[in-house]
């Protein structure tokens, strides 16, 4: 991690919601989802918040050797966003505790605030992390 990654870092990230990021597309094999409204799925919104945070911190990491993984999501989802709307995420790094980063997040779709909350990420060494995943897979196959 570079010294530039510190509390107070702010960022903004925008994304135009396509049809394939709506609830029916979240788990196509789940018939229940197929009957639900065509609005941004909460699962995709969480992924969008993760993407915004990754995009904000990557210039402050030794990318791609250093990467980050999500370890906590505490977000509400208070308004529906139809396809074609642009979601804008505004965030601030509120804590840097070793390799653990905490973000304050707010998202809106140009009409409503759709989310507010916090997200935490942990900075990892990608090679070491991938090795531990490989070892875990080997345990299940043994």
Language model features by range: what are they?
Residues 2-40:
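Catalytic strand-loop segment that frames the active site of acyl-thioester-processing enzymes
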Residues 12-18, 76, 120-122:
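Generic structural detector for well-ordered beta-strands
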Residues 92-142:
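HotDog/MaoC-like acyl-thioester-processing domains
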Residues 53-88:
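Hydrophobic beta-strand-centered segment that forms part of the acyl-chain substrate-binding groove
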């Amino acid at each position: 991690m570079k010294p530039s990654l510190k509390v107070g870092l702010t960022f903004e990230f925008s994304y135009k919601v396509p049809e394939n990021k709506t609830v029916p597309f979240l788990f196509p094999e789940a018939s229940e989802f197929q009957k639900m409204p065509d609005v941004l799925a909460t699962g995709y919104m969480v992924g969008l918040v993760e993407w915004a945070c990754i995009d904000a911190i990557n210039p402050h990491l030794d990318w791609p050797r250093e990467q980050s993984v999500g370890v906590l999501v505490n977000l509400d989802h208070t308004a529906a966003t139809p396809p074609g709307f642009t979601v804008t995420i505004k965030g601030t790094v509120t804590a840097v505790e070793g390799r653990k980063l905490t973000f304050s997040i707010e998202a809106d779709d140009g009409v409503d605030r759709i989310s507010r909350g916090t997200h935490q990420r942990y900075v990892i060494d990608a090679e070491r992390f991938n090795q531990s995943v490989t070892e875990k897979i080997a345990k299940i196959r043994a």
